[in-house]
Amino acid sequence: MPIINQLLHSVKLIPDFVPHSGVRGLLILHGFLGMSDNWKTLGKQYAQEGFEVHILDLRNHGRSFHSEGFSYELMVQDVYEYCKANNLIKISIIGHSMGGKTAMLLATTYPEMVDKLIVADIGPKFYPQHHQSILEGLNTVDFSKKPSRNEVEEILSQYIPDFGARQFLMKSLYWQEPGQLAFRFNLQVFNTKIEEIGKPLPDNSVFNKPTLFIRGGNSNYILDEDFENIKKHFPDSRIETVPNVGHWIHAENPLLFYEMTSSFLK
Protein backbone atom coordinates (compact mmCIF):
# COMPACT_ATOMS: atom_id res chain seq x y z
CA MET A 1 0.00 0.00 0.00
CA PRO A 2 1.41 3.45 -0.90
CA ILE A 3 2.54 5.40 2.16
CA ILE A 4 0.10 8.25 1.41
CA ASN A 5 -2.81 5.79 1.68
CA GLN A 6 -1.62 4.93 5.18
CA LEU A 7 -1.25 8.59 6.16
CA LEU A 8 -4.46 9.98 4.63
CA HIS A 9 -7.70 8.31 5.65
CA SER A 10 -10.36 8.20 2.95
CA VAL A 11 -13.84 6.87 2.36
CA LYS A 12 -14.06 5.32 -1.09
CA LEU A 13 -17.48 4.78 -2.68
CA ILE A 14 -17.71 2.75 -5.88
CA PRO A 15 -20.68 3.05 -8.28
CA ASP A 16 -22.90 0.00 -8.83
CA PHE A 17 -22.69 0.45 -12.60
CA VAL A 18 -20.32 1.77 -15.24
CA PRO A 19 -21.81 4.70 -17.21
CA HIS A 20 -21.39 4.84 -21.01
CA SER A 21 -18.89 7.64 -20.52
CA GLY A 22 -16.89 5.53 -18.06
CA VAL A 23 -16.41 5.93 -14.31
CA ARG A 24 -15.21 9.42 -13.32
CA GLY A 25 -13.32 10.29 -10.17
CA LEU A 26 -14.84 12.72 -7.66
CA LEU A 27 -12.81 14.04 -4.75
CA ILE A 28 -14.52 15.62 -1.73
CA LEU A 29 -12.58 17.81 0.73
CA HIS A 30 -14.11 18.84 4.07
CA GLY A 31 -13.76 22.15 5.90
CA PHE A 32 -11.78 23.23 8.96
CA LEU A 33 -12.41 20.97 11.99
CA GLY A 34 -14.49 18.67 9.77
CA MET A 35 -13.91 15.13 8.53
CA SER A 36 -14.96 12.73 5.80
CA ASP A 37 -17.91 11.45 7.85
CA ASN A 38 -19.67 14.80 7.24
CA TRP A 39 -19.96 13.91 3.54
CA LYS A 40 -20.83 10.20 3.46
CA THR A 41 -24.54 10.59 2.70
CA LEU A 42 -23.93 12.95 -0.22
CA GLY A 43 -20.98 10.81 -1.33
CA LYS A 44 -23.26 7.79 -1.72
CA GLN A 45 -25.58 9.83 -3.93
CA TYR A 46 -22.72 10.87 -6.22
CA ALA A 47 -21.62 7.23 -6.44
CA GLN A 48 -25.14 6.32 -7.60
CA GLU A 49 -24.58 8.80 -10.47
CA GLY A 50 -21.59 6.74 -11.62
CA PHE A 51 -18.75 8.53 -9.83
CA GLU A 52 -15.92 6.80 -7.99
CA VAL A 53 -16.03 8.99 -4.89
CA HIS A 54 -13.05 9.61 -2.63
CA ILE A 55 -13.82 11.57 0.56
CA LEU A 56 -10.57 12.49 2.28
CA ASP A 57 -9.66 13.41 5.83
CA LEU A 58 -7.12 16.20 5.34
CA ARG A 59 -3.96 16.21 7.48
CA ASN A 60 -4.55 16.96 11.19
CA HIS A 61 -8.25 16.09 10.75
CA GLY A 62 -10.39 12.98 11.21
CA ARG A 63 -8.47 9.71 11.05
CA SER A 64 -5.58 11.12 9.00
CA PHE A 65 -2.07 11.72 10.28
CA HIS A 66 -1.09 14.53 12.64
CA SER A 67 1.79 16.80 11.68
CA GLU A 68 3.43 20.02 12.85
CA GLY A 69 3.23 21.13 9.23
CA PHE A 70 -0.10 22.73 8.32
CA SER A 71 -0.68 24.89 5.25
CA TYR A 72 -2.67 24.88 2.02
CA GLU A 73 0.49 24.03 0.08
CA LEU A 74 1.09 20.94 2.22
CA MET A 75 -2.55 19.83 1.99
CA VAL A 76 -2.43 20.20 -1.80
CA GLN A 77 0.68 18.02 -1.97
CA ASP A 78 -1.00 15.39 0.23
CA VAL A 79 -4.04 15.31 -2.06
CA TYR A 80 -1.89 15.28 -5.20
CA GLU A 81 0.12 12.29 -3.90
CA TYR A 82 -3.12 10.53 -2.94
CA CYS A 83 -4.53 11.03 -6.45
CA LYS A 84 -1.35 9.69 -8.05
CA ALA A 85 -1.29 6.66 -5.75
CA ASN A 86 -4.94 5.87 -6.51
CA ASN A 87 -4.78 6.40 -10.29
CA LEU A 88 -7.05 9.43 -10.19
CA ILE A 89 -5.80 11.00 -13.41
CA LYS A 90 -8.81 13.21 -14.22
CA ILE A 91 -11.04 14.27 -11.36
CA SER A 92 -13.75 16.66 -10.36
CA ILE A 93 -13.47 18.19 -6.90
CA ILE A 94 -15.96 19.45 -4.32
CA GLY A 95 -14.39 21.44 -1.50
CA HIS A 96 -16.11 23.18 1.40
CA SER A 97 -14.54 26.13 3.25
CA MET A 98 -10.92 25.13 4.04
CA GLY A 99 -11.40 22.19 1.68
CA GLY A 100 -12.59 24.66 -0.96
CA LYS A 101 -9.42 26.73 -0.60
CA THR A 102 -7.38 23.52 -0.87
CA ALA A 103 -9.35 22.53 -3.98
CA MET A 104 -8.77 25.97 -5.56
CA LEU A 105 -5.02 25.75 -4.99
CA LEU A 106 -4.92 22.16 -6.27
CA ALA A 107 -6.83 23.08 -9.44
CA THR A 108 -4.64 26.11 -10.17
CA THR A 109 -1.42 24.20 -9.41
CA TYR A 110 -2.30 20.99 -11.30
CA PRO A 111 -4.97 22.08 -13.82
CA GLU A 112 -4.29 19.04 -16.02
CA MET A 113 -5.68 16.82 -13.23
CA VAL A 114 -8.97 18.63 -12.68
CA ASP A 115 -11.97 18.60 -15.03
CA LYS A 116 -14.48 20.52 -12.94
CA LEU A 117 -14.28 22.36 -9.64
CA ILE A 118 -17.02 23.05 -7.08
CA VAL A 119 -16.27 25.40 -4.19
CA ALA A 120 -18.76 25.66 -1.31
CA ASP A 121 -18.96 28.94 0.63
CA ILE A 122 -15.40 30.21 0.42
CA GLY A 123 -13.65 32.61 -1.92
CA PRO A 124 -10.03 32.96 -3.02
CA LYS A 125 -9.53 36.10 -0.90
CA PHE A 126 -7.81 36.58 2.48
CA TYR A 127 -10.08 35.99 5.50
CA PRO A 128 -9.28 37.57 8.89
CA GLN A 129 -9.15 35.14 11.80
CA HIS A 130 -12.63 34.44 13.19
CA HIS A 131 -12.36 31.06 14.92
CA GLN A 132 -11.24 32.43 18.30
CA SER A 133 -14.36 31.52 20.30
CA ILE A 134 -14.46 28.02 18.79
CA LEU A 135 -10.79 27.39 19.61
CA GLU A 136 -11.26 28.85 23.09
CA GLY A 137 -14.13 26.47 23.74
CA LEU A 138 -12.25 23.45 22.40
CA ASN A 139 -9.19 24.32 24.52
CA THR A 140 -11.33 24.63 27.64
CA VAL A 141 -12.26 20.93 27.49
CA ASP A 142 -9.96 19.10 29.94
CA PHE A 143 -9.91 15.47 28.86
CA SER A 144 -7.73 14.49 31.85
CA LYS A 145 -10.91 14.87 33.93
CA LYS A 146 -12.53 12.21 31.71
CA PRO A 147 -15.67 14.20 30.84
CA SER A 148 -18.70 12.51 29.29
CA ARG A 149 -20.01 13.50 25.85
CA ASN A 150 -22.75 15.55 27.51
CA GLU A 151 -20.21 17.35 29.69
CA VAL A 152 -18.08 18.18 26.65
CA GLU A 153 -21.11 19.63 24.87
CA GLU A 154 -22.04 21.63 27.96
CA ILE A 155 -18.55 23.20 28.02
CA LEU A 156 -18.68 23.97 24.29
CA SER A 157 -22.15 25.53 24.60
CA GLN A 158 -20.66 28.31 26.77
CA TYR A 159 -18.46 29.39 23.84
CA ILE A 160 -20.40 28.18 20.79
CA PRO A 161 -24.11 29.05 21.14
CA ASP A 162 -25.04 27.66 17.71
CA PHE A 163 -26.36 24.11 18.16
CA GLY A 164 -25.52 23.05 14.60
CA ALA A 165 -21.91 24.22 14.95
CA ARG A 166 -21.57 22.28 18.23
CA GLN A 167 -22.98 19.11 16.67
CA PHE A 168 -20.52 19.50 13.80
CA LEU A 169 -17.60 19.67 16.26
CA MET A 170 -18.96 16.80 18.38
CA LYS A 171 -18.64 14.49 15.36
CA SER A 172 -14.86 14.63 15.88
CA LEU A 173 -15.20 13.38 19.46
CA TYR A 174 -14.28 9.71 19.89
CA TRP A 175 -13.41 7.13 22.55
CA GLN A 176 -9.61 7.00 22.57
CA GLU A 177 -9.92 4.14 25.06
CA PRO A 178 -12.70 3.00 27.42
CA GLY A 179 -13.78 5.99 29.49
CA GLN A 180 -11.43 8.40 27.71
CA LEU A 181 -12.75 10.79 25.06
CA ALA A 182 -10.58 12.89 22.72
CA PHE A 183 -10.91 15.05 19.63
CA ARG A 184 -9.70 13.54 16.36
CA PHE A 185 -8.31 16.82 15.04
CA ASN A 186 -4.91 18.22 16.02
CA LEU A 187 -5.96 21.11 18.23
CA GLN A 188 -2.39 21.82 19.36
CA VAL A 189 -1.28 22.63 15.81
CA PHE A 190 -4.41 24.67 15.05
CA ASN A 191 -3.68 26.84 18.11
CA THR A 192 -0.32 27.88 16.65
CA LYS A 193 -1.09 27.85 12.92
CA ILE A 194 -4.68 29.06 12.72
CA GLU A 195 -3.63 32.03 10.53
CA GLU A 196 -2.93 29.55 7.71
CA ILE A 197 -6.69 29.03 7.28
CA GLY A 198 -7.30 32.60 6.16
CA LYS A 199 -4.52 32.85 3.58
CA PRO A 200 -5.58 33.87 0.05
CA LEU A 201 -5.00 32.06 -3.20
CA PRO A 202 -1.74 33.32 -4.77
CA ASP A 203 -2.41 36.35 -6.94
CA ASN A 204 -1.30 34.72 -10.20
CA SER A 205 -3.28 31.49 -9.72
CA VAL A 206 -5.78 30.84 -12.54
CA PHE A 207 -7.98 27.84 -13.41
CA ASN A 208 -9.68 28.12 -16.81
CA LYS A 209 -12.03 25.12 -16.64
CA PRO A 210 -15.68 25.03 -15.47
CA THR A 211 -16.02 26.10 -11.84
CA LEU A 212 -19.09 26.46 -9.64
CA PHE A 213 -19.09 28.57 -6.48
CA ILE A 214 -22.04 27.97 -4.15
CA ARG A 215 -22.67 30.39 -1.30
CA GLY A 216 -25.13 30.34 1.57
CA GLY A 217 -27.73 33.09 1.43
CA ASN A 218 -27.26 33.80 5.15
CA SER A 219 -23.47 33.46 5.04
CA ASN A 220 -20.99 36.31 4.63
CA TYR A 221 -18.09 34.24 3.26
CA ILE A 222 -18.75 35.21 -0.38
CA LEU A 223 -20.03 38.77 -0.87
CA ASP A 224 -21.21 40.42 -4.08
CA GLU A 225 -18.03 42.50 -4.15
CA ASP A 226 -15.97 39.27 -4.24
CA PHE A 227 -17.33 38.27 -7.66
CA GLU A 228 -14.71 40.24 -9.61
CA ASN A 229 -11.83 38.58 -7.74
CA ILE A 230 -13.39 35.14 -8.22
CA LYS A 231 -13.68 35.74 -11.97
CA LYS A 232 -10.05 36.86 -12.10
CA HIS A 233 -8.87 33.49 -10.76
CA PHE A 234 -11.66 31.39 -12.30
CA PRO A 235 -12.75 32.96 -15.63
CA ASP A 236 -15.11 30.08 -16.49
CA SER A 237 -16.99 30.22 -13.20
CA ARG A 238 -20.49 30.93 -12.06
CA ILE A 239 -21.72 31.78 -8.58
CA GLU A 240 -24.98 30.37 -7.21
CA THR A 241 -26.75 31.13 -3.94
CA VAL A 242 -28.68 28.68 -1.76
CA PRO A 243 -31.26 30.79 0.11
CA ASN A 244 -31.89 30.59 3.85
CA VAL A 245 -28.74 28.65 4.76
CA GLY A 246 -25.48 29.61 6.42
CA HIS A 247 -21.93 28.37 5.97
CA TRP A 248 -22.71 24.62 6.12
CA ILE A 249 -24.79 24.58 2.94
CA HIS A 250 -24.45 20.83 2.32
CA ALA A 251 -25.72 20.05 5.83
CA GLU A 252 -28.49 22.66 5.97
CA ASN A 253 -30.00 21.98 2.53
CA PRO A 254 -28.44 18.74 1.24
CA LEU A 255 -31.19 18.21 -1.35
CA LEU A 256 -30.66 21.52 -3.16
CA PHE A 257 -26.88 21.26 -2.77
CA TYR A 258 -26.95 17.83 -4.38
CA GLU A 259 -29.21 18.99 -7.23
CA MET A 260 -26.97 21.96 -8.03
CA THR A 261 -23.71 20.01 -7.86
CA SER A 262 -24.99 16.92 -9.65
CA SER A 263 -26.34 19.02 -12.52
CA PHE A 264 -23.02 20.86 -12.85
CA LEU A 265 -20.95 17.66 -12.81
CA LYS A 266 -22.94 15.97 -15.61
Name the predicted role of every residue range.
Residues 14, 43-48, 52-94, 259:
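Active-site loop/oxyanion-hole signature of alpha/beta-hydrolase fold enzymes
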Residues 33-41:
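Serine-hydrolase catalytic-loop signature spanning alpha/beta hydrolases and amidase-signature enzymes
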Residues 129, 144-201:
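Conserved alpha/beta-hydrolase catalytic His-Asp/Glu region
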Residues 177-233, 238-241:
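Conserved serine/cysteine hydrolase catalytic core
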Residues 1-27, 48-51, 88-89, 195, ...:
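Alpha/beta-hydrolase fold catalytic core
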Residues 104-108, 115-147:
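Flexible "cap/lid" loop of the alpha/beta hydrolase fold
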Residues 95, 99, 103:
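Gly/Ala-rich beta-loop-alpha elbow adjacent to hydrolase catalytic centers
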Residues 237-266:
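Catalytic active-site module of serine/aspartate enzymes centered on a nucleophile-bearing elbow/loop
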